[in-house]
Amino acid sequence: MTQVWTVVVPVKRLGVAKSRLRGALPDQPHEALALALAVDTVSAVLACPVVADVLVVTDDPAVATETGMAGARVVPDRPAAGLNSAVRHGAATAGAGWIAGLTADLPALRPAELAAALSAARTGPTSRRYLPDAPGTGTVLLAAPPGVPLNPRFGGSSAAAHAASGALALLGDWPSLRRDVDTATDLAEAARLGLGPRTALLCGTAAPTAGRSV
């Protein structure tokens, strides 16, 4: 597979990230869980065979250190104006080329599923493409071809917002990519798919072996 994609992953400061997950793991600090979700997500993206570069947009020192050590390019969140501004900033930093914005809460993500979705985004109409989350209301992935602005609309009811903005939905069976984690129930569902090593350690579950790498 040809590595053509730059993937932008925005990550909030850990103290305010994933607020609905606070208390999901009573024996673990909330910040540790938020960091684990981000690190497992970024690690899976780095392992994706069609991804050439991963930009993590964050102002959190721990996120910057850990994802940078994993191999991501860390971009300070200069706008500091929310998720969509961070994605736009990362895309502008990346420059021309195939670009995607991805949420940082996909701890079960399989690199092969991300590769399949990104490859699907390069087929058909030359336009922005988005992938709804598991419930179908949010968005986990937004992709654009060279020369087309991402124009992100992440947030509540973002799937409908992206569709209304002219983006086309991606269709495929990619459960680990669509399983974002906002609540304790989401985390349990991600665990059934197989968590990445950092999140699995915190949850006290066995990390998947070869299954997650495909």
From Swiss-Prot:
The keyword Nucleotidyltransferase applies. Guanylyltransferase that catalyzes the activation of phosphoenolpyruvate (PEP) as enolpyruvoyl-2-diphospho-5'-guanosine, via the condensation of PEP with GTP. It is involved in the biosynthesis of coenzyme F420, a hydride carrier cofactor. It comes from Salinispora arenicola (strain CNS-205). Belongs to the CofC family. Pathway: Cofactor biosynthesis; coenzyme F420 biosynthesis. This is Phosphoenolpyruvate guanylyltransferase. It is an enzyme of class 2 (transferase). PANTHER family: 2-PHOSPHO-L-LACTATE GUANYLYLTRANSFERASE.
